[in-house]
Amino acid sequence: MKISFDFDSTLECEEMQELAIKFIASGADVFITTSRTDYHEGLKIPNNDLFEVADRIGIKKENITFTKFKHKYKFTKDFDIHYDDDEIEIDNINKFPSKCMGFLYEPKHNNQQANF
């Protein structure tokens, strides 16, 4: 099974990291698909926070995709599941034909339960 997570406001949250760790432990291939860019005007952007989380939970660097602000449905076609906090990205993933199912993640605020 191939599982993808957005990073900002999704995999950067501890409960989603715990979910990713469970998927990895069950043998799933886990990926990060982020709208971020890794280069801007020829300069490499470090994305240290993203790589730190990926290293800590066991996501391989080759499983990280920077979409450079392009729609994620173009990058998630071969995944089974993608989690994201962006409703438009999830709607697009579920609207365009592919095997990937998109699930909206709504981070919890002020001791509320997360919705995913």
Positions of predicted regions on the chain:
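Alpha-helical substrate-recognition element adjacent to the catalytic core
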Residues: M1-F69
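A short acidic, amphipathic alpha-helical/loop segment
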Residues: E15-F23, F75, D91-F96
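Short, well-ordered alpha-helix to beta-strand connector turns
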Residues: G27-A28, K61, K77-F79, P97, ...
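Short, hydrophobic beta-strand segments that form beta-sheet elements in well-ordered domains
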Residues: I32-T33, T65, D80-D84, C100-Y105
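Noncatalytic linker/hinge segments flanking ATPase motor cores
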Residues: I45-E52, Y73-I81, F103-K108
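Conserved Lys-Pro-Asp/Glu-containing loop-to-beta segment of HAD-superfamily phosphomonoesterases
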Residues: I64, F69-I93
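Asp-based, Mg2+/Mn2+-dependent phosphohydrolase catalytic module
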Residues: E87-F116
